[in-house]
């Protein structure tokens, strides 16, 4: 949409960038490439310009918010803390596009990569499964190789595991505050939690 978004300044009357779905599909009178009417169901809205209370009329919105919202269209949840009832947390923080990594660089002009969990959900990475004792393992830089190790948690085969990635300051990860091994503990039995902004589960 034209103008700025509320992600810069939540108290203003601008629209929040978001992804959602209509309760009922909307069938347009427009014909698509397949010859059928175009149907609108899932959508995303993003601002044209950067700025909060005052729009920066000469600054096109950096790509971080667009990339984050497109992640939702692909089916990914927000991975930042939306409910501090159990204590404040940054979720995955700047280490993932689906958390605050969408804001890296100048207000999101160089957003971080998605975490290995996100890329695994989308089928974009194939982890190397470590299912026996080893003394060492090589793991390439995640941003350039997509390398990720998967280690099952003892007695929880198929639903609890660790993902290990090597994050270095290169490419879209060049604005991370640090670098090294990221180890995620995944429990597939847990739901994604309540998304307070959309009022439902994500």
Language model feature labels by segment:
Residues 2-176, 184-189:
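Extracellular hydrolytic enzyme modules, especially secreted metalloproteases
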């Amino acid at each position: 949409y034209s103008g700025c978004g509320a992600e810069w300044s939540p108290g203003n009357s601008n629209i929040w960038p978001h992804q959602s779905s209509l309760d009922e599909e909307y069938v347009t009178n427009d014909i698509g490439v397949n010859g059928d009417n175009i149907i609108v169901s899932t959508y995303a809205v993003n601002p044209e310009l950067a700025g909060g209370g005052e729009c920066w009329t000469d600054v096109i919105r950096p790509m971080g918010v667009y990339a984050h919202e497109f992640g939702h269209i692909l089916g990914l949840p927000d991975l930042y803390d939306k409910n501090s009832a159990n204590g404040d947390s940054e979720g995955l923080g700047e280490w993932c596009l689906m958390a605050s990594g969408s804001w890296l660089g100048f207000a999101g002009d160089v957003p971080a990569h998605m975490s290995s969990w996100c890329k695994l959900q989308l089928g974009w990475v194939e982890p190397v499964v470590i299912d026996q004792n080893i003394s060492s393992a090589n793991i390439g830089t995640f941003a350039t190789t997509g390398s990720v190790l998967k280690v099952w948690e003892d007695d929880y085969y198929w639903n609890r595991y660790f993902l290990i990635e090597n994050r270095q300051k290169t490419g879209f990860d060049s604005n991370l505050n640090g670098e090294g091994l990221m180890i995620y503990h995944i429990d597939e039995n847990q739901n994604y939690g309540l998304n307070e902004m959309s009022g439902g589960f994500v």
